[in-house]
Amino acid sequence: MAPRKPSKKVGPQKRPSAEKRVITSKKKQLRNQSFKSKVRTILKKFELAVQSGDVESISAGLRSVYSIADKAVKRGIFKKGKADRVKSRASERACPAA
């Protein structure tokens, strides 16, 4: 019988379902990271609008913050409390400026 090639993996070998789970979790992680990055970008744009003091851009930014936070909850990326906290802080920042 031919000698077996040494495995590159350390530890027990994974079953096909476990390998698939690793692959899908990595895909989901990339998707979530991308979406969280989008959320942070929108929050930064909103913060710049608040600093500029332009009422129209503040209200548009606040709408986009609310929308993206709700989408994050719908997709399971944020919990409801986290989204509520993000929206609350954004509205606090918008009120003195508006």
From Swiss-Prot:
The keyword Transcription does not apply. HAMAP family: Ribosomal_bS20. The keyword Ribonucleoprotein applies. GO terms for molecular function: small ribosomal subunit rRNA binding; structural constituent of ribosome. One of its GO terms (biological process) is translation. This is Small ribosomal subunit protein bS20. NCBIfam families: S20. Binds directly to 16S ribosomal RNA. GO terms for cellular component: cytosol; small ribosomal subunit. Belongs to the bacterial ribosomal protein bS20 family.
